[in-house]
Design a protein with these regions (language model features):
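Conserved active-site segments centered on acidic
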Residues: 1-77, 134, 138-144
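Phosphate-binding/catalytic loops
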Residues: 81, 87-144
């Protein structure tokens, strides 16, 4: 269980933040970590400036050339865990996967992570994402 993909609506705020925070926390480089979108609305767009700013503030390395990418059926096959950032993302993932990968689809944290695209609160998003990534990393290690 070492391949994880974080998924949000557009793949420009929450899921790339989770991707880069988790990569930073995974000091042993044990995990293969990526992020995707449930929609194609932001396809190819770079990580949101608010996300980039907060990652810089906390000295989290990130790929500034990363572009938004919609999740595919091949992704459901490849990844061991498909983690939706909120309940709506999980519902979309369950629908997109048509019931074939329900066991891989998980909610990032109880209550989800509010979308800073709408809230404007990238600081709160970062705190929730960091705490959630720590929990996921421990959860994964406990199952190895």
């Amino acid at each position: 269980m070492n391949k994880i993909v974080f998924v949000c609506l557009g793949n420009i705020c929450r899921s790339p933040m989770a991707e880069f925070v988790m990569k930073e926390l995974d000091q042993e480089k044990y995990l293969h970590i990526e992020s995707r979108a449930t929609s194609s609305w932001e396809h190819g767009n770079s990580v949101h400036q608010g996300t980039q700013k907060i990652l810089r503030k906390y000295a989290i390395s990130f790929d500034s050339s990363k572009g938004s990418q919609q999740i595919s059926q091949a992704d459901f096959e490849f990844f061991d865990l498909v983690v939706g950032m909120d309940e709506s993302n999980v519902e979309d993932l369950l629908q997109i996967s048509a019931g074939r990968y329900d066991d891989k689809i998980k909610l990032f944290r109880p209550g989800g992570v509010p979308d800073p695209w709408y809230t404007g609160d990238f600081e709160e998003t970062y705190k929730l994402v960091t705490a959630g990534c720590r929990d996921w990393l421990q959860w994964i290690k406990d199952r190895q």
